[in-house]
Swiss-Prot record:
Family according to the record: Belongs to the polysaccharide monooxygenase AA14 family.
Note accompanying the cofactor annotation: Binds 1 copper ion per subunit.
Reported cofactor(s): Cu(2+)
Regions of compositional bias (Low complexity) in chain numbering: 339-365, 372-390
Name this protein carries in UniProt: AA14 family lytic polysaccharide monooxygenase A
Signal sequence range: 1-23
GO MF term set: metal ion binding; monooxygenase activity
One GO CC annotation: extracellular region
Entry EC number(s): 1.14.99.-
InterPro entries, sorted: LPMO_AA14
Compositionally skewed regions (Polar residues) per UniProt: 319-338, 396-408
Length: 434
């Protein structure tokens, strides 16, 4: 007994330390609200990161069999805003009473009370990369597929405080039985191992609901300024405008993003996500440079083409050399269908056609307005592509031929042997730590 005491104490310390690391969305409406470290054969608490997992493990965090109580919904006031609770530990939230460890710091607005910022994967406020919420207009969780989700709100300074505001666009009403939503986060590549976070929850649009259906979502594309990787200027023409899917990255299967370890995708302007309500979601997702033609027929066909790539049932896993070397064009986040090898597992319940994600087409005027807004947003900090640039000016920075090519190649890593050696050392340290 005495001989085993040090090992037991070490385990307790390790569990206590890990209990406050990482972050999750917390609410009674969530799947896995009462999941503990002992529920699964592995630690699958809501705040545990998702990395190199099978589809069933990472999708809804593997918590579909742990639904919220009947009638528990997270309310989304159409055209308003909502406060979300983001924390490393359920015990530090208003829901501490149902936490295995009880109150562990509730009252602080820190996402991880008493812990350094490294516990929620950032070196400081200038290193946070944003998080988002997405919605699927399906009441049965077994009907929800990855391409049903549309990102409707982002917070660019997330994760930084426990109380995190999300602005809500004029969303239409949910079907009978409510909608499904999810919180997504990908942290800075230099502040933790490559991983994603996803927590699903039941949601309901309330108040003065809209009547405009959401557009068909497309995969986000890297288009913002990225000076850390040698791209000081944004390329707005490469943005996906309109409805966008969440970003599924670095899993064994089900990925729609294929950026490598040091090129993590983020829910911010780097991928065309504005801070706040995503008010362009009422048009089909399409590459900005294609939408600038002003022809609604071109927009519709382009959106259908892009969405077909995004919603294909086959996705490759991690990047491989077969995907080709980085091109001179700004990298796309869509993929060549011929290279797709790993399908989404199909649900045991067939999708309900009566609750399918509503879609819409928009006029060329709407497209031009949205394109101008995107141009202004991603160009705000650029001296080359100004906020007053016309759509034609923007398109000149990225050719249509480059943009419509569905083959995606990863962005080249920073040059220099010293830089690469430092990054490899950093990655090894992070993997050992997590």
């Amino acid at each position: 007994m005495l001989a085993s005491l040090p090992a037991s104490l070490a385990l307790v310390v390790a569990l206590a330390t890990s209990a406050s690391a990482h972050a999750a969305f917390w609410d009674k409406s969530m799947y896995g609200f009462n999941v503990t470290a002992q529920t699964f054969s592995y630690d699958n608490r809501p705040q545990v990161p998702l990395y190199d997992m099978t589809f069933d493990q990472w999708w809804f965090h593997g918590h579909k069999d742990y639904p919220p109580n009947e009638g528990d919904f997270f309310e989304l006031p159409a055209g308003g805003e909502v406060n979300a609770i983001i924390s490393c530990d359920k015990g530090a939230t208003p829901f501490y009473a149902s936490s295995p460890g009880g109150d562990s710091g509730y009252g602080s607005d820190s996402p991880c009370p008493g812990q350094p910022t490294s516990e929620y994967h950032t070196t400081g406020i200038d290193d946070v990369k944003g998080c988002c919420m997405a919605i699927a207009y399906k009441a049965d969780v077994n009907d929800v597929q990855p391409d049903d989700f549309v990102v409707f709100s982002c917070n660019a300074t997330c994760v930084w405080t426990m109380n995190t505001k999300f602005e809500i666009p004029k969303l239409p009403a949910c079907p009978e039985g409510g909608c499904h939503c999810a919180w997504f986060w990908i942290h800075s590549y230099d502040s933790g191992a490559e991983q994603i976070y996803m927590n699903g929850f039941k949601c309901q649009v309330t108040g003065d609901v809209g009547t405009q259906p959401l557009g068909k979502p497309a995969v986000p594309r890297r288009c913002g300024a990225d000076p850390d990787h040698g791209r000081p200027d944004p390329v707005p023409g490469n943005c996906t405008i309109g409805a966008k899917t969440p970003m599924y990255w670095y899993q064994k299967e089900g990925n729609n993003m294929f950026e490598d370890t040091y090129d993590a995708p983020y829910y911010n302007q780097l991928y065309g996500f504005a801070d706040g309500a995503q008010n362009d979601i009422f048009m089909d997702g399409v590459i900005a440079s294609l939408a600038s033609s002003g022809a609604s027929s071109t927009l519709t066909s382009s959106a259908d083409s892009l969405s077909a790539v995004a919603s294909s049932t086959s996705y490759p896993a991690h990047p491989t050399s077969s995907q080709g070397a980085a091109s001179t064009a700004y990298p796309s986040s869509s993929t060549d269908a011929a290279s797709m090898t790993q399908p989404y597992p199909t649900s045991s319940s067939s999708s309900s056609t009566s609750e399918a994600q509503p879609t819409s087409s928009r006029s060329s005027t709407d497209v031009q307005t949205t394109l101008s807004a995107v141009t202004s947003s991603v160009s705000a900090d650029s001296s080359t592509v100004s906020a007053s640039s016309t759509p034609e000016d923007v398109v000149a920075t990225t050719s249509t031929a480059e943009s419509i090519n569905p083959t995606r190649s990863c962005k080249p890593r920073p040059s220099g042997a010293a830089v690469q050696k430092k990054k490899r050392k950093h990655a090894r340290r992070l993997h050992n730590a997590h």
